[in-house]
């Protein structure tokens, strides 16, 4: 059991809680397969405690870096099989929160829907939170988020539909959630991207004073990131790339607003993307359109390739 041919079957709230508790106990499930056999109703859980935990990186005066001993990665393969998680209250008390808070380098979450009966809420002053994952170093594939983001916590930053911070691959994902109340920076798919985002789509209405992007808030080249100083992650590609993505959602804000990306730093790459939706700027009108302009002086025209913007 637990193989690709005979995965562990998850069919109930109890199974989800068991997986969450086991990962919290330090079991990463590297190479182990899980598969949903039906929709999972989490309504009997007042607040689902998430799968995995990210406490960040630690260092010493010698420049050595390591993962916090509190980190708990999910390294297995979780196949939603086209089914949905329903009626969950996902309460982000800490940074880097989602249904899966930490998807490790070998982890895969795919074919999973977080439907509109789920509610994401948050403590004040948290960052990098999303319906599906807090931080991803692995692969998120063919997942859809439609959760309710109608909470009122203050100073919530890097709020996203799919993943708060991405170093891995996000492909074939869709956000349908509107984000118009809480949150100081918002995106449909990824909050901060150092990895690859492709063939993904935002359909949600995103509104904020600033830092609003249909696909990602920030697209970055992560050269020099502390994560790369840890042997297990030295081979990570941390050049932010966004390709074949579409924003269909209305976007509005005062500054750093983009149909695809709000801010493109340090030679992040964007290609074959489209923003057919009109987005609105107000007050200072400091907004960015593809492909001519971006907010952080990417000088090479090759950073934007074959993009279309009707805003």
Name each region found by the language model:
Residues 1-311:
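Surface-exposed repetitive/solenoidal architectures
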């Amino acid at each position: 059991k637990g193989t690709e041919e005979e995965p562990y079957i998850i069919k109930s709230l109890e199974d989800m809680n068991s997986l969450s508790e086991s990962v919290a106990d330090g079991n990463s499930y590297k190479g182990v397969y899980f598969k949903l056999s039906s929709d999972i109703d989490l309504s009997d859980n007042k607040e689902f405690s998430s799968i995995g935990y990210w406490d960040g990186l630690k260092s010493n005066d010698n420049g050595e870096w390591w993962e916090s001993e509190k980190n708990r990665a999910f390294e297995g393969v979780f196949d939603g099989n086209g089914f949905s998680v329903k009626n969950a209250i996902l309460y982000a008390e800490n940074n880097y929160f989602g249904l899966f808070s930490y998807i490790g380098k070998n982890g895969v979450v795919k074919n999973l829907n977080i439907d509109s009966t789920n509610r994401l809420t948050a403590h004040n002053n948290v960052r990098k939170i999303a319906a599906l994952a807090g931080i991803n170093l692995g692969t998120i594939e063919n997942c859809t988020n439609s959760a309710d983001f109608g909470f009122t916590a203050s100073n919530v930053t890097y709020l996203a539909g799919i993943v708060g911070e991405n170093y891995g691959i996000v492909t074939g994902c869709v956000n349908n959630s509107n984000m118009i109340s809480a949150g100081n920076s918002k995106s449909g798919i990824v909050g901060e991207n150092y990895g690859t985002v492709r063939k993904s789509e935002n359909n949600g209405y995103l509104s904020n004073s600033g830092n609003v992007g249909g696909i990602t808030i920030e697209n970055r080249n992560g050269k020099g990131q502390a994560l790369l100083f840890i042997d297990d992650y030295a081979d990570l590609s941390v050049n932010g790339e966004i390709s074949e993505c579409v924003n269909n959602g209305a976007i509005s804000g005062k500054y750093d607003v983009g149909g695809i990306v709000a801010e493109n730093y340090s030679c992040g790459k964007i290609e074959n993307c489209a923003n057919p939706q009109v987005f609105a700027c107000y007050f200072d009108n400091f907004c960015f359109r593809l492909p001519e302009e971006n907010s952080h002086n990417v000088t090479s025209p090759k950073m934007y390739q074959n993009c279309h913007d009707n805003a």
